[in-house]
């Protein structure tokens, strides 16, 4: 697969110079590179582009100190389930979750396909922080402790769900998103004075 390659991590990249691959090629190449510890994802996101949704991935090469940028395009309504990179590389989960949440793209075998931030312009408006699907475990000696939504001062407000067996915490799930500010929309707006 071809990438736009730069060693300047602060550079602007012309969108028309970023190579576009098919999803199958994108998936296989990224899965192979992420198996090598020298690579990790800097960002992976999608944006509407005419009648398609274009996803961009910034892959960081820690050995050669380069940024590799690639993309793929999928149709909004004719897209089948896409293989999930998260199933092979857990570091991808927040990126795939956001793409699902914002645009409704479905990834097969996604082990933790839950909302991430509840942006105002999300694909499924009926999904809200109030009906967040917390992880559950059944058992006579287990109990759940729900804390929040609270603001701890350092992090944004969130709800914390502990699953405990006596005093031992078996699982903690944190739901953030109470304070989503729509940064992506702000940065891509034509009238944005910050750009």
Please place each PLM-identified region on the residue numbering.
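Terminal low-complexity/charged segments
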Residues: 1-172
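Function-dense linear segments that define catalytic or interfacial modules
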Residues: 158-195
